[in-house]
């Protein structure tokens, strides 16, 4: 297909939370390849409202990385950015109680799916001097009891971005620290079944953030992710950045 003039952005984890809010923020601003394991009513509405600019790739991010890039090129002729947002928190368990297979599943989603998608995106992003925007976490640099698998996966993301910044100077690669966001993941964290593993103090900390209204709105993070995806700033490449700097 002939290359479109608008930016073409691939977005993972697009069916809910930060991903859905980002898809909404990108309306009228870009062509979007929305990748998700499920098609929620909210995402389906976006697809119906934007038939010429939104394409859905349904599947697990561990399986559709290459195919999603190919879809972008086939449909729109180029790729300008990837926003890699899909991720999971579970297993929530202390290391001594860890199920190594559950760790592997988490790393497949949070890290290896990212590496695979980035690998296949790079040749196209070189042509457009595009951007790689990956949702990281404060947990990459801070200990939370029973979150070792998640913390380690996000620390790996930050190092991946540092290496990308060195290896691909024409592509802006950033890891974004989103803060504590009001998403389904936070609902899971506050579940009483996690209190024993996390410890009462940590568990109560997250519950108090919700009750005191301190959680960040997904729409605020979406503004930052959209801005970064649409604007290549070489000075930022390889960095772990705070979302507040871009809204």
Swiss-Prot record:
The keyword Protein transport does not apply. The keyword Transport does not apply. NADP(+) binds at residues 11, 85, 119, 150, 154, 181, 183. One of its GO terms (cellular component) is nucleus. InterPro entries: NAD(P)-bd_dom_sf, Sc_DH/Rdtase_CS, SDR_fam. Its EC number is 1.-.-.-. It holds the Pfam family adh_short. One of its GO terms (molecular function) is sepiapterin reductase (NADP+) activity. The active site is at 136 (proton donor), 150 (proton acceptor), 154 (lowers pka of active site tyr). It comes from Schizosaccharomyces pombe (strain 972 / ATCC 24843) (Fission yeast). One of its GO terms (biological process) is tetrahydrobiopterin biosynthetic process. PROSITE patterns: ADH_SHORT. Keywords: NADP, Oxidoreductase. Belongs to the short-chain dehydrogenases/reductases (SDR) family. This is Uncharacterized oxidoreductase C30D10.05c.
């Amino acid at each position: 297909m002939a290359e479109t003039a608008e930016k073409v952005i691939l977005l993972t984890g697009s069916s809910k939370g930060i991903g859905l809010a980002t898809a909404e923020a990108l309306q009228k601003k870009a062509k979007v390849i929305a990748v998700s394991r499920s098609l929620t009513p909210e995402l389906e509405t976006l697809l119906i409202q934007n038939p010429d600019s939104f394409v859905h790739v349904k599947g697990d991010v561990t399986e559709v990385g290459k195919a999603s890039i190919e879809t972008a090129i086939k449909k729109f002729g180029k790729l300008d950015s990837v926003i890699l947002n899909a991720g999971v928190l579970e297993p929530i368990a202390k290391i001594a109680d860890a199920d190594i297979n559950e760790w592997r599943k988490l790393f497949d989603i949070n890290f290896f799916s990212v590496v695979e998608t980035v690998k296949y995106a790079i040749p196209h992003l070189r042509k457009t001097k595009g951007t790689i925007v990956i949702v990281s976490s404060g947990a990459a640099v801070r200990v939370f009891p029973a979150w070792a698998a998640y913390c380690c996966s996000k620390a790996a993301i930050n190092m991946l971005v540092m290496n990308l910044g060195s290896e691909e100077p024409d592509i802006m690669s950033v890891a974004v620290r989103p803060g504590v966001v009001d998403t389904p993941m936070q609902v899971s964290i506050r579940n009483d079944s996690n209190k024993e593993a996390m410890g009462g103090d940590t568990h109560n900390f997250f519950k108090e953030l919700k009750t005191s209204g301190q959680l960040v709105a997904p729409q605020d993070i979406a503004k930052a992710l959209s801005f970064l995806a649409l604007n290549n700033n070489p000075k930022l490449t390889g960095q772990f950045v705070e979302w507040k700097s871009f809204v």
